[in-house]
Amino acid sequence: MVSPTVAALPSDNPESDMSVLHSLYGYGFVGVVIVSTLFLQFVGKEHWMYLTLFWAVPSIFASVLLFIAKLPDMNMEQDEVKTVNTKHRTKSLVLCVACIFLGACAENTMSNWISVYTENALNMPKVWGDIFGMSFFAIFLALTRTFYAKYGKNIYKVLTFSMIGAVVCYVIVAISPSAIISLIACVVVGICTSMLWPGTLILMEEKVPEVGVAAYALMAAGGDFGASFAPQTLGVIVDNVSVSEWAVNIGLVLSLTPEQVGFKFGMLIATIFPILGVILLAYMKKHFGQA
């Protein structure tokens, strides 16, 4: 609901507003990771239930703020008068939903697994993996969105180069023998994927005007599905590869455990999402060029 609300607000630069909105997610992510890591490290993991209660408080405050806020008038459905080509419009929305799905896959595969990956595949202590891996991932994700809000333009090129960058980073994470280089690549994924979710919303607003709240709901569903599907898929891949005989044999050659082989193979498979994203964006450029 927040995205269409912000989009409905009068603004001289709606792209900037959308980017700033989504940058707050990154800053919140950083806060949660650092506070939770320090709490579990110094207070004790046995007191985790108090941490859960603590993080329930911001949600309560957010609910109160949303309840008392004055919301702008929003277009709940598309305007038939302004709809020139319904078939083209519907296809455009489907393409945008597919794009945000792939973007969410690329972003959340790493954000969900970076802590476990640095601990198990790179043999780093969990506390350092959380702080230097997950936290820096979120910091750069937030800073990139903030930077785009101030200086960014040409969202199509941003999305395309972001997908390409994500492909490169995932490949480095998967095949690099250096733990430091792999960790840096994990963090840089945060930069590359930072604009994929908000950027697709911006692209939709530019190419499919007067979409209405329903379109934002579809976009949110596509993004949420990608954020769930990709990390779960990686988990299934890691579990199955780790117990395979060929993973044991490869591990003996590369001096890796079967689980480490599973993680690296999973990260290599994860490149399929940004690769498909590059192909999709190339098609979308042709599609919108015919509008």
Where are these regions (language model features)?
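Hydrophobic/aromatic end-of-helix segments at the C-terminal termini of transmembrane alpha-helices
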Residues: V2, A106-T118, T200, M204, ...
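Intracellular juxtamembrane helix-capping segments at the cytosolic ends
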Residues: M1-S11, M195-V208
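A late C-terminal transmembrane helix in Major Facilitator Superfamily
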Residues: E210-W246
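Helix-loop-helix hairpin linking two adjacent transmembrane segments in secondary transporters
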Residues: D12-M74
